[in-house]
């Protein structure tokens, strides 16, 4: 088995971070590059249900704020937690996380996707531990490459 590129999608939740040890271990075992992917929220997808769109400038301002916040958090995470990986690259995408993960798996020519069994949804909704998260479930079913799932504690 040859693994040159590992894609680690994260929503920066505490559950998502539980995959860090496996990401570091696998990247060192295979001397693989780690691509860290964060997907920003597409706020426009929420507004049709409410009837009115907010001012586009405000949406852009919020998106810019979220991207900057995510970039800072990802840089800190990589500096503190992934510093022992051979090579790290950060990617930010906008929109549906599943779509972004699948697209980046192909774009980055990932050999492996590493995910935690749950992410932000479990933090917000208190999803039972025995139910796999919706993003992870969809990636397992649709991924063109192998998926390594880290069971959350």
Language-model features: where?
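Small/aliphatic-rich secondary-structure junction motif
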Residues: 1-56
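Short beta->alpha linker loops
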Residues: 69, 92-96, 153
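Generic structural signal for helix capping and beta-alpha/helix-loop junctions
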Residues: 43-44, 100, 122
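A short acidic, glycine-rich active-site loop
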Residues: 55-72
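General small-molecule cofactor/ligand-binding pocket signal
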Residues: 35-37, 89-93, 148
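Structural beta-alpha unit
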Residues: 1, 15, 79-113
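Gly/Ser-rich helix-loop-strand patches that form or flank binding pockets
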Residues: 104-153
């Amino acid at each position: 088995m040859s693994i040159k590129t590992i894609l680690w999608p994260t929503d920066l939740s505490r559950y998502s971070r539980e995959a860090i040890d496996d990401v570091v271990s696998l990247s060192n075992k295979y001397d693989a590059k780690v691509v860290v992917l964060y997907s920003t929220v597409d706020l426009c997808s929420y507004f049709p249900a409410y009837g009115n769109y907010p001012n586009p400038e405000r949406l852009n301002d919020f998106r810019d704020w979220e991207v900057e916040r995510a970039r800072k958090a990802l840089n800190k995470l990589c500096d503190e937690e992934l510093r022992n990986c051979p090579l790290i690259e950060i990617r930010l995408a906008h929109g549906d996380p599943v779509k972004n993960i699948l697209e980046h798996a192909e774009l980055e020519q990932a050999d492996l996707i590493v995910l935690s069994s749950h992410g932000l949804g479990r933090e917000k909704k208190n999803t039972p531990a025995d139910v796999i998260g919706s993003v992870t479930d969809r990636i397992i079913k649709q991924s063109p490459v192998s998926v390594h799932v880290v069971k959350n504690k």
